[in-house]
Amino acid sequence: MKHLLIIFISLFSFTVISCSSSSDDGSKSTTTETNISVGSDGYVASAQLSAFDYPEWTVGAFINSSMRNNLLKSVYSYFKDEFDFIFLLQNETASDLGYHGMYIGVSNDVMGISEDKEGFDATKYTGSNGKLKAVIHFPKKTGVQWGPSLHELMHHWGNHSLSTGNLAAYSFDQNVLLPEDELKQINAGSHWGISSVNGQLGGFDLSTLQELGGNWYTADPFGTFANGGNSIPYGNFELYLMGLIPPDNVTDVVLFSGLKATAKEFLDDDKWYAEGKTTVSVEDVINKLGSRVPDYTASQ
């Protein structure tokens, strides 16, 4: 098994105070070259952004492909094209952005983990030549140590497998106001939702699942899209998708469909109604998506 190589880039800026004439309309860009240095321990690089660029990163520059790729190209002007993942870690203790971590895929050639039969490669836009797999941004400096770094890394392999047809993982739209409000069933998307995967991308512990009768179920408290930062290990099915264990070691996954519950029932009482309950084996996944290529003996 090959090892993944990750580089951690800490983003910061010095405050620059300058005087300008009243006729300065701000139309000229003050973007300057990014200065990158490596810490004495050799594990983390620091990128000093300009006083013009850095504020943009505090309000969402990561989702701007131009600004993101310009920064990545600066990284590759300092380093060889050897990294599988680049973690961009904002040197902040608080953030107003609506996420704790965000994964953006750059390339992926793993087969058997999604319905994609060709893979993709957009590395040419980043300064990499086919090596970089993804870039992940953490708005706060605790993102790597406490999470969601393991969660965001898992998005390279999932969830793209339990997402369609009779192998779809479902969840609830929890955007409600009152305890008696009905939760709406939604597709869990790139997370595990109300399923027994029990990993970084959500799901409950199957050993705690109980049938209450009348198609009602309960389990120990769990998250439908995350389960508690880096304190939570990867789930069994997640390890398979990552190429770390063989199919023979994968336990079945329980999925539910036709979900119903009020906000109080699900969020406070940890119970839900389901019209259907499905047990999915790794063989079901392989029949749908094909075998994982490379397998666990040759995966990275």
What does each model-found stretch correspond to?
Residues F83-L89, H160, D252-G258:
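Surface-exposed patches in mature extracellular/periplasmic domains of secreted proteins
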Residues F85-L89, H155-G158, Y240-G243:
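Structural recognition of the beta-strand scaffold that forms the well-ordered cores
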Residues I6-T15:
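Bacterial N-terminal signal peptides
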Residues L150-Y170:
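Catalytic Zn2+-binding segment of zinc metalloproteases
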Residues F14-I36:
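Bacterial Sec-dependent N-terminal signal peptides
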Residues M1-L4:
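Positively charged n-region of N-terminal signal peptides that target proteins for export
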Residues T31-S149, L153, K271-Q300:
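Zn2+-dependent metallopeptidase catalytic core
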